[in-house]
Amino acid sequence: STSQPLNLSTSVFDISSPYISRLARIDGVARLTEKERLFKIAIEDNKSLGHSPGQFIMLSIPGYGEAPISISSTPSKKNTFEICVRAVGNLTNALHRLTKGDRLWMRGPYGKAFPIENLKGKDLLFVAGGIGLVPMRSLIKTILNERIAYGKIHLLYGVKAPDEILFKDELTEWGQHGISIQITIDKPHPEWKGNTGVVTTLLPPLKIDETRTVAIVIGPPIMYKYVIMSLGDKRIAGHNIYLSLERRMKCGLGKCGHCQINSVYVCQEGPVFRLSDIRYLREAI
C-alpha cells in the first residue's frame, strides 16, 4: 500500500503544544548599542505569538543551541514580535550575525506575566537596571496604550555608562506621555550631565504615595536586594512589589531543574513574582 502524506491538521502532532518549535524569520534588525540589537521576528505560520508582558520565548538556531529570551514588544494579533538581545554567548553572537530574511526556531511563550488588572488605578514605580528595561518595555508600552487607566508613573533607570542606554528615542516619547523618567549612570562620565550613582540613589528623594503605589523591578540579580531595601524605606508593602527574576532557564517547561529555587521553578511559576510570595525563599533574591 502507498503511504499517505502527513496531514498536520489531523496529525497526532499538536503544533500548538509548548514542546513544538515554530519556524520564524527575522523581519528587521536595529542596532541599539554596541552590544544590543532589536530584532523583529515574524512567525512563519502567520499566527500571533499570543504573549503577555513579562513572558519569554525559547529561541534556537540549529548548531548553536537554545536560550530563553524576553519578549520586548506589546501583545499583538499580528504574527510579529520583538526581542532585544545582548551578544554574550554562543547563540546570541550567532543571532547577531543574522540579517533580515534569515530563519530561526522558537517556542513559547512561557512563564507567568505581569498582572495588568492588578496595576490599573494604581501609581506605578518602575525600577530598571541595564537590560532589565527590555522585558519592562513590553509592560510600559502596554500601559501607555491605556494610559488613562493608571495614576502617576515613575521610571528609574540605571546603566553603567551613557552609551548603554537602551531605547533612547522611546524614553523621550514615554516622557511625553506622562511618565516621569530619571536615568542614572554608575560612575562619572565626561559626556554625562545627569545623575551619577547606582539606581537606588534615585529612590530617597522620590515623592510617592505608598498606599497606592505598585513597584515593578527588573535588573541584574545584585540589584534586587538593595532596591527592595529602598522600597521598604518608602513603606511599599511586599504584596505591591513585583520582580522579574533572572535565572538560568534551559527548557522553559519546568522539567530540567536549572531554574529551580527550593521548590519553585522560575520558568513556570515566574519569571514574574510578587515579593511577598518569595521573600522567604532562600537564594531567591
What residue spans do the PLM features occupy?
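Local cysteine-cluster metal-coordination motifs and their immediate loop/turn environment
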Residues: 222, 246-271
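Ferredoxin-reductase
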Residues: 3, 7, 11-102, 159-161
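Short microdomains enriched in Cys/His and/or Lys/Arg
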Residues: 127, 273-285
